[in-house]
């Protein structure tokens, strides 16, 4: 059977690093307050010349170099983002052009922080359906553009960045020992749409708007939703938490990460955490964390890796991959 096998990874971060202490003169907060509640110590913030497209392009080029491929080898680009360069055309098309790729097709996917997990699942379906042999999956965000910098409950949480992964068609035996995407589960429930949202848009206010969040409400639902979708993914693959080599969760809040891992029985040493370095980068969160763990040698060929994310909507999901 056809499997979607990981061929390469890449990442890109804005030049500017903003430490927690930098917020102390802007809003009523402190490094201690932020670290205690979120685990975040710093985040990268895009300069005027750094955009979702430019960061996505840089991550894509890094992934291509890592895979030993060129843009000509890619059939499809799927970009997960909630902060596109323009309302239209899709920022994926702009990245396609920046890469000099004038064949195949490209589109954006919007599932907020769950975007990359949704995008990997979608890319897998295109590959297994025979419509693409190699897919460049990108998560790229510039959330700093939609933050209310006077709202201490949100402005300290988010950062900018991009990560990319290349999937390619490979042969598998149809067992859990296969390399590639092995199982996935996706969920959404719009009843929660007002708990995490942006208060603007072209069809409503004609403005970009700012991010708004009911933090306690998000936390209240997060752990249960995350563990349920992961357990569904385990069931689909016929495995348990003990079989995992690595858990790469959405990097939103260290307390949510810890509580989810504990509830699932995943050992702390198997959890990849980069929220302290990047903050919450929405759809870029999971591929950035993946890139760190691949680059430092933790994730190796043959490892069983679980990706998970939850975002506004609510949307949430999990993907199981044999590296």
Curated annotation (Swiss-Prot):
The protein's annotated pathway: Lipid metabolism; fatty acid biosynthesis
Subunit structure: Homodimer.
Gene3D superfamilies linked to this entry: 3.40.47.10
Species classification: Bacteria, Pseudomonadati, Pseudomonadota, Alphaproteobacteria, Hyphomicrobiales
Domain of life: Bacteria
Record remark on domains: The last Arg residue of the ACP-binding site is essential for the weak association between ACP/AcpP and FabH.
Keyword Lyase belongs to the record: no
Cellular compartments annotated: Cytoplasm
GO molecular function: 3-oxoacyl-[acyl-carrier-protein] synthase activity; beta-ketoacyl-acyl-carrier-protein synthase III activity
Membership in a protein family: Belongs to the thiolase-like superfamily. FabH family.
Region of interest (ACP-binding), residue spans: 251-255
EC top class, as a word: transferase
Residues annotated as catalytic: 113, 250, 280
Database matches in Pfam families: ACP_syn_III (PF08545), ACP_syn_III_C (PF08541)
InterPro entries, A to Z: ACP_syn_III_C, ACP_syn_III_N, FabH, Thiolase-like
Catalytic activity field: malonyl-[ACP] + acetyl-CoA + H(+) = 3-oxobutanoyl-[ACP] + CO2 + CoA
Keywords from the UniProt entry: Acyltransferase, Cytoplasm, Fatty acid biosynthesis, Fatty acid metabolism, Lipid biosynthesis, Lipid metabolism, Multifunctional enzyme, Transferase
Principal place of residence: cytoplasm
The enzyme's E.C. designation: 2.3.1.180
General function of this protein: Catalyzes the condensation reaction of fatty acid synthesis by the addition to an acyl acceptor of two carbons from malonyl-ACP. Catalyzes the first condensation reaction which initiates fatty acid synthesis and may therefore play a role in governing the total rate of fatty acid production. Possesses both acetoacetyl-ACP synthase and acetyl transacylase activities. Its substrate specificity determines the biosynthesis of branched-chain and/or straight-chain of fatty acids.
GO cellular component term of the entry, any: cytoplasm
One example of a Gene Ontology biological process annotation: fatty acid biosynthetic process
Entry protein name: Beta-ketoacyl-[acyl-carrier-protein] synthase III
